[in-house]
Amino acid sequence: MKSFTRNLRRFQTPRRNLHGISYTPKKVEGVSFAGRETPTATGSLSVVINAGSRYQPDAGVSHLLEKFAFKTTEERSALRITRESELLGGQLSTQITREHIILTARFLNEYLEYYARLLAEVVDATKFLPFQLTEEVLPTARIESELFREDILRVAMAKLHEKAFHRGIGNEVYLPASASPSISEIKDFASKAYVKSNFSVISSGPDVQKASDLCAKYFAVIPDGSPLKSAPTKISSGESRVYSKGTNYFCLGFPAPAASPELFVLSSILGGDAAVKWSHGNTLLAKAAGTASEYKATAVADLTPYSDASLLSVVISGSCPKAIKATASESFKALKSLSSNIPNDVVKSGIAMAKTKYLSAFEPVTLNAISASSLVSASKGSDAFISGFDKVTPASISKVVSSLLAKPASTVAVGNLDVLPYYDEL
């Protein structure tokens, strides 16, 4: 290993411009725009709206607003939108996250203008029809909410956010079973969310100048308005326990201020996912799982970034609750060990893994939650933030770990609660 490290420079090539993340940001007709050109025949156009569950006035409103996308507008029926896009070979999709609603069109680059006009039309001229709420939007949202509630791990992570942040980022993303927002609530929220200062347009694939010009042409009619506001995120903690007969989970959550390069590197150092197929990996959490339970349970770390906060999570899962309890204790011990005396090689490896994972999020033609959040953030999407990975040191990692451990973590236990631990038992 030492000889490999010494000879590593032989394998390195000169660093090139990071085209995968190099979006060109600008303001066009009051709209925030960012674009990159790629040597592909297809591209995408996304509208990233700051209207996720963090900003909603009542539970479920953001989810229903997202489901109204690509329904009837002032110019086209929902059927016409569907048929026209199918004839052009396009794909229309929507996502909702804790901070954003993302409307995306993927298409052959030659049809860029059609989709730029369609997305602007959806934002500016959606008709919120009562019958569509009753017959299409509500049923679709309820099905998606049911699927969410059937996924025990997703429910556990939602509970972890609730305990770590309480309100705002901690709000429930999907429509609660008992909620039924009115059409007037949705229309009122849309009128405040669909304004120029509250969304960004992201182009990936087509000619950047052409995409920018079309954005200026079609999005210019949208009202200016003021961005939606949310109270600053408050970091909290707590424990939640849910009985379940299925797979057991124990989730640890360490809330922190806005994501830093150190937090991304820390997440990679903890790891848990194997970098080589059919292996357990050599990260701290992989070793913890092997030591504590001979891999009868697994432990995986992940960092979820938001605009003014982030959540470092460690998820321990398996069928044996005793193995999970032992692995949770060993994983917590592994995290505490990083508060001092971290070997340089561990940090170098963590930096490389963190950069690979972070930059890979920008490679797909369509946006995901991480790339969307970073692109609309002036700090996390910049070259300065990316170069910050190379400045991470053992001392800076230790400082972050000490800060995370200064207050109790949030925990969620799902499964056999007679065996799964409490935080103070780790």
Swiss-Prot record:
InterPro entries: Metalloenz_LuxS/M16, MPP/UQCRC_Complex, Pept_M16_N, Peptidase_M16_C. Its main location: mitochondrion. Keywords: Electron transport, Membrane, Mitochondrion, Mitochondrion inner membrane, Respiratory chain, Transit peptide, Transport. GO terms for molecular function: metal ion binding; structural molecule activity. Transmembrane segments: none annotated. One of its GO terms (cellular component) is respiratory chain complex III. Residues 1-30 form a transit peptide. It is a peripheral membrane protein. GO terms for biological process: mitochondrial electron transport, ubiquinol to cytochrome c; proton transmembrane transport. Pfam families: Peptidase_M16, Peptidase_M16_C. It comes from the Eukaryota. It is found in: Mitochondrion inner membrane. Disulfide bonds: none annotated. Belongs to the peptidase M16 family. UQCRC2/QCR2 subfamily. Component of the ubiquinol-cytochrome c oxidoreductase (cytochrome b-c1 complex, complex III, CIII), a multisubunit enzyme composed of 3 respiratory subunits cytochrome b, cytochrome c1 and Rieske protein, 2 core protein subunits, and additional low-molecular weight protein subunits. The complex exists as an obligatory dimer and forms supercomplexes (SCs) in the inner mitochondrial membrane with cytochrome c oxidase (complex IV, CIV). Component of the ubiquinol-cytochrome c oxidoreductase, a multisubunit transmembrane complex that is part of the mitochondrial electron transport chain which drives oxidative phosphorylation. This is Cytochrome b-c1 complex subunit 2, mitochondrial. The lineage of its organism: Eukaryota, Fungi, Dikarya, Ascomycota, Taphrinomycotina. The gene is qcr2.
